[in-house]
Amino acid sequence: MNGLIKHTAIALAIIIPLAAFSAYAAPMSAPSTTTSNVTTDKTTTATLAIKPSSIIHKSASKPTTVDSVDLEQYAGTWYEIGRLPMYFQRKCASDVTATYTGKTDGSGITVINKCSGENGTAITAEGLAKPADNTGSKLKVSFLPSWIRWLPVGRADYWVLARDSDYKTALVGTPDKKYLWLLARSPNITQQTYAKYREIAQQQGYDLKEFKLTAQSNQTVNLVP
């Protein structure tokens, strides 16, 4: 028994820090539909589903989420347009995506994160997301091994701060304001959409000095940071 306890303790010491990688997750499609590489983004200020209270003073302790997220519409593959630096993404040089698929047994949402390293090496991580409440706008995500996910640790908060009405673009961040991702169904969005989401992030209190755009193989639009 002592040997088992010691083994488990060592495993936890190694594995639990990996839970921070869950912030690298991106939002569940009716499994994903085919996305075009052509820029078809028509997001405007009016189509962004933003709660009025989300426009808060940046000194507020926590950001505000959208009122609701339909997880079936939210499912599928998302391209990372840009992000704040994150340790567990330090080896991702380009082509960052996240695919969400609802589990048939209703136990949660499978999250598959992928990216390409500096030398073109494929990097993949699999995790499990669960809604934190009935709005769907807050997810608890874990990348711990399945045999240890029952522990009440290693789950990162993943909040949808803004999205458009068609679930084509979304802004996701952590409540401590350390991490932030701009996501889209296509690797291309307009400069107008990019600027609007940056504005929302700043109004929510996120520091964007280190925000970086993500290179995608099929990008045809060069955004101005």
Region roles according to the model:
Residues 2-10, 17-225:
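A beta-rich soluble binding module of mature secreted/lumenal proteins
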